[in-house]
Regions:
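Solvent-exposed beta-strand sheet faces enriched in polar/charged residues
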Residues: 11, 56, 97, 125-127, ...
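Short beta-strand/loop segment at the start of cytosolic alpha/beta domains
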Residues: 1-23, 48-54, 230, 371-377
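Short, active-site-adjacent cap segments at secondary-structure transitions
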Residues: 60-64, 103-104, 415-416
């Protein structure tokens, strides 16, 4: 064995040279790895005794991608494009031996080899689009040559990995080998190539799968228009694959290179890379280190089988944790379980679950009408109506029933966890776990730390979030926590704007164009205008109250802020317009022209300001945690990085200037937070905190 450098070595097995990369944890393509591979290939290529080469990685995976710590820094070592050219032009057959994940630059390197073999569990993909860029070392040019244009479009523009078996079907992998015998099988595969004098299959020279039909690209764009809305990178990926079809290989490579260089310096890629790291940061809690012991959660109890309770329960059942679900009435229990079953059956219809899986999952539920059934649960989550008195009563009863050491969690979206915890003799075991609706789909989990919540309870809740595929963000106790507290700012301004001169569809249009999935009024119509409304307490003082009194309660009644046709397609409503105009006149408001810019600033800047207050009060650990809440819980566009990142992008001095201008015009709702003032005075942004 010859060590090329500290992370790459070269060994001979008969006439086959084996290059091994050993750079834990994931063999990322650092400068050392790239340079080592280039030197090893050149050395083996020049050795007359060597007839074929295998590239293989030690540890748990093949090269898992670029080394993102090198992003944005001056380049060192041999560039990946050059390493790939050395591999492809090697006069001896080069075989990539793949296990674990061959992603991004790792797959691009494998595409530059003449042959690829993989173990059955391997995954291969080009996820660069998720970081707001395109593959930059030949991925967009070589992949369509191997798998065809249609499959390449999906793999590259969606950024989703494919399994080894699928990769073999599509021609990306030449052989699927033994799970436990990769190295030996790859060497045997290479030796067989030598024995048969097999040709050097250079991917760059293959054109048999490059169909140039423009209709394929047009159809792909049309089908995915909604999915790609607002994002720059997917369109850039499509254009690079078009280049693979219309340009000679080297020109296509140059086009790809120019594209990645352009995207790398754009705000979208900056935002998407920021989110990638921010999500990992969110799991780190300064006073709850990774070494904090966690409690074993073998069984979960859920109180409430409604929309929230059922959705929450599915998360645990999906990962094999049995759930006892409790309701007060049998019909509520039956209804809840039948909704869950229907959800699973729909997933099965789409081919993502077998009917046997559906039965296995349903078999993990134990329904009950008695809270005492929760006595053996390790975690109990209360998902009852959002009312403090009801929640206090439930926790008082739980205190007497739950076993010692059980975690007692509330799924409240606004209420004070400390007051709820005070109903028990064990406030250290109480925590907030605020799921977002639909709870089996939305990725966010706000974990609410009470004044007395124990550290191992926090560590357990954050770990569980990961287990059930959620992004856990730790927040402090305050009305609405992080997400809903900031949302209230936007909602207040949206409501004021429609009386001052805008219409609901103006506000919705501006926020939709900004990149949000829907505006506040379309959202209210979808959720139901009568949530939290009652005829007894209605004063008829807001458009929403008047709409509810008229039984215009949103999509479910065919009309709310908007009118809906039989397909639930919304259109501007003259009824709503008249309600707003009459109410404004009654309140003595002189309506005026409101610009799109004002709508955006008044809806977004107060949220940024509220985020600053949340940081000031220590209710969130870092600005990026607030951004992760908004991206995963409220559909904030990833390519804008979150409200706090957006504030930094606009420039906090500009945000402050506009807030002060609005404060002069509209009063205290726009008073800037002390933190915002301080950061501007120091010439800093939230990123510097």
């Amino acid at each position: 064995v010859t060590a090329i450098n500290e992370v790459v070595d070269l060994a001979a097995e008969g006439t086959v040279a084996v290059i091994t990369v050993n750079s834990p944890p994931v063999n990322a393509l650092s400068a050392n790895v790239r340079t080592g591979i280039a030197e090893a290939v050149q050395k083996a290529g020049a050795d007359a005794a060597v007839k074929a080469i295998v590239i293989h990685c030690a540890g748990r995976t093949f090269i898992a991608g670029a080394d993102i710590t090198e992003f944005g820094k001056p380049p060192k070592g041999v560039p990946l494009g050059e390493v790939n050219a050395i591999l492809e032009s090697c006069p001896k057959p080069v075989v990539a031996a793949i296990h674990g994940t061959a992603l991004g630059g790792g797959l691009e390197l494998a595409l530059s080899c003449h042959y690829r073999v993989a173990v059955p569990s391997a995954k291969l993909g080009l996820p660069e689009v998720k970081l707001g860029i395109v593959p930059g070392a030949g991925g967009t040019q070589r992949l369509p040559r191997l798998v065809g244009v249609e499959r390449a479009l999906e793999v590259i523009a969606f950024g989703e990995p494919m399994k080894a078996s699928e990769a073999a079907t599509h021609g990306l992998v030449d052989a699927v080998v033994g799970e436990a015998s990769l190295r030996a099988d790859a060497v045997a595969f290479a030796a067989k190539l030598v024995a048969e004098a097999a040709p050097l299959k250079k991917v760059r020279d293959r054109t048999d799968k490059l169909s140039a039909d423009p209709a394929v690209f047009a159809a792909f764009r049309k089908t995915n228009a909604r999915r790609f809305r607002g994002f720059e990178a997917p369109e850039a990926c499509i254009q690079c694959i078009e280049a693979a079809v219309t340009m000679p290989f080297d020109e296509g490579l140059k086009y790809e290179r120019d594209t990645i260089m352009r995207l790398m310096v754009g705000t979208q890629s900056l935002a998407q890379r920021y989110v990638f790291f921010a999500e990992r940061q969110a799991a780190k809690i300064p006073d709850v280190p990774d070494t904090t012991p966690t409690r074993k959660i073998g069984k979960v109890g859920i109180i409430g089988a409604g929309t929230m309770g059922g959705g929450i329960a599915m998360n645990f059942v999906n990962v094999g944790i049995p759930v006892t679900i409790v309701e007060t009435k049998q019909e509520a229990l039956d209804r809840g379980l039948s909704v869950i079953r229907k959800n699973y059956e729909n997933t099965a219809k789409r081919g993502r679950l077998s009917m046997a899986d559906v039965e296995t999952r349903m078999g993990r539920f134990t329904p009950s009408l008695d809270l005492a059934a929760l006595a053996d649960c390790d975690l109990i989550i209360e998902a009852v109506f959002e009312n403090m008195e009801i929640k206090k009563e439930v926790f008082g009863k739980l205190d007497a029933i739950a076993k010692k050491g059980a975690i007692l969690a509330s799924n409240t979206s606004y209420l004070d966890i400390d007051k709820i915890a005070a109903m028990t003799t064990r406030p250290e075991d109480v925590i907030g776990m605020h799921f977002f609706s639909p709870a089996n789909v939305m990725r966010l989990l706000e974990v609410v730390r009470g004044e007395k919540t124990a550290k191992d309870v926090i560590a357990t809740a954050m770990g569980l979030a990961k287990t059930i595929g959620k992004v856990g963000v730790l927040v402090g106790v305050c009305h609405g926590f992080v997400g809903n507290r900031m949302l209230a700012q936007r909602q207040r301004e949206a409501n004021k704007l429609i009386l001052e001169g805008a219409m609901p569809w103006d506000v919705d249009r501006v926020l939709y164009a900004f990149g949000l999935p829907m505006g506040p009024f379309a959202m209210s119509d979808l959720a139901g205008l009568d949530i939290g409304w009652s005829r007894e307490t209605s004063k008829g003082e807001t458009p929403r109250e008047i709409l509810c009194e008229m039984d215009r309660r949103g999509q479910k009644t065919g009309a709310g802020f908007y009118d809906y046709d039989e397909n639930r397609v919304a259109k501007a409503s003259p009824v709503t317009e008249k309600i707003i105009l009459d109410l404004a006149a009654k309140k003595g408001i002189n309506r005026r022209e409101v610009s799109d810019e004002e709508i955006l600033q008044r809806c977004i800047y107060p949220m940024i300001n509220e985020g600053a207050k949340i940081l000031e009060e220590g209710k969130a650990i870092r600005a990026s945690d607030i951004d992760i809440v908004w991206i995963n819980g409220y559909g904030w566009p990833v390519y804008r990085g979150g409200p706090m990142f957006y504030g930094d992008t606009v420039g906090l001095a500009e945000v402050l200037r506009v807030m002060k201008e609005f404060e002069g015009r509209h009063g205290a709702d726009f008073t800037p937070s002390a933190l915002l003032e301080r950061l501007v005075a120091e010439g800093k942004g939230f990123k510097d905190l």
